[in-house]
Structures are given as C-alpha cells and as structure tokens.
Amino acid sequence: MPKPTKGPRLGGSSSHQKALLANLATSLFEHGRIKTTEPKARALRPYAEKLITHAKKGELHNRREVMKKIRDKDVVHTLFAEIGPFFADREGGYTRIIKVEPRKGDNAPMAVIELVREKTVTSEANRARRVGASKQTAPVAAAAAPQAAVEPEATEGPDADDSSALPEAEDTTASEASRSTETDDPTQDSDADKS
C-alpha cells in the first residue's frame, strides 16, 4: 500500500519526486558532493543512506533493489564496489549537509550534501594514541627533572662543565665527519663498478 511522505512534496507529483530523488542520489554517488536546495538535501539524506546500507550488504538482492531506484549501472557499480565497502564499519551517518549562501536569483536557501569521507575509528585510534603518548612522556619528563637537579651539584664550578663539554663536542663532530666520509666512499666505488 502506498504511503505518503512526510513534509512538502518536491516537484508536485509523487512520480516527479521519485525521479528527482533518484537523479540527486545518482549525482551524489557519482561526484561525492552536490549543491542543491536545503529541502532537497534534507529529503535526499535518508534516501541516499538507505541505498548505501543496501550497498554495504552487497548481495544480489540488494543490488537489484538499488537498480530499481538508480538506473545508471556505472554509478551502481561504484556504489557497491567503493562506497559500500568504505562505510562497512560505520553504522549510519554516511552523509553530511552543510548550509551555504542563498541562491542569487531567487534567494532560495542552498546546501551542500556530501559523503562523509573520514574514518571515525581511525581518527579515534589516532587520538587515543596521542593521549597515551603524552601520558608516557609526562612521567619521563618528571623523572628527568630530579636527575637534572642532581647533576649540577656533583660538578664543582661552572668552568669545569664548560671545559669538559667542549672536547666531547669536538670528538663527536669528528667521529660523525669520519662516518659520513666512510658512507660516501662505498657509493662512489659502486658507481665506478657500474660504468
């Protein structure tokens, strides 16, 4: 039994509304984002999300159900091969509506509807990793602070620190320079062998 849709009918008749939503969904899946009026974007959102849910299941029956609404086989293939698997871990909320400035000609409220391309699981994991890393560095920094306070007491006078630090710095730069020349020589020999 046909049931009426909520809200105002877009386009006048039910057949026009079905065709309008099918064309909007086709454009959305083809381009990833489209600019349309706000009421059309709000009507398209549940329509497109149901189609993406069918694509996530990926069975033949689901493909046929989507083909009833979207007639472009290339777009249906993109939906089932790329968009559906991309949202496999996500339970809804596949689209986002962003309001933009009104249309210049008739001042109609406009919006951009787009597919959400961020992975929420990975962003949450990255955030948790950063929080864990900052918690680990805080105790290490706290442990290093008492050691730094002990070291100046062990040495006698500022002149002893400066004189001992300079020769060590010169030794490290000399050893680094010798390492860099050693690594450069084998590459030159291998270049000579090739030619």
Swiss-Prot record:
One term of GO molecular function: structural constituent of ribosome
UniProt keyword annotation of Ribosomal protein present: yes
Metal-binding among keywords: no
Keywords of this entry: Ribonucleoprotein, Ribosomal protein
GO cellular component terms listed in the entry, alphabetical order: cytosolic large ribosomal subunit
Gene Ontology terms describing biological process: translation
Region (Disordered): 125-195
Sequence ranges of Low complexity compositional bias: 136-152
Compositionally biased tracts (Acidic residues): 153-173, 183-195
Recorded superkingdom: Bacteria
InterPro entries linked: Ribosomal_bL17, Ribosomal_bL17_CS, Ribosomal_bL17_sf
Subunit structure: Part of the 50S ribosomal subunit. Contacts protein L32.
Family classification: Belongs to the bacterial ribosomal protein bL17 family.
Name recorded for this polypeptide: Large ribosomal subunit protein bL17
Gene that encodes it: rplQ
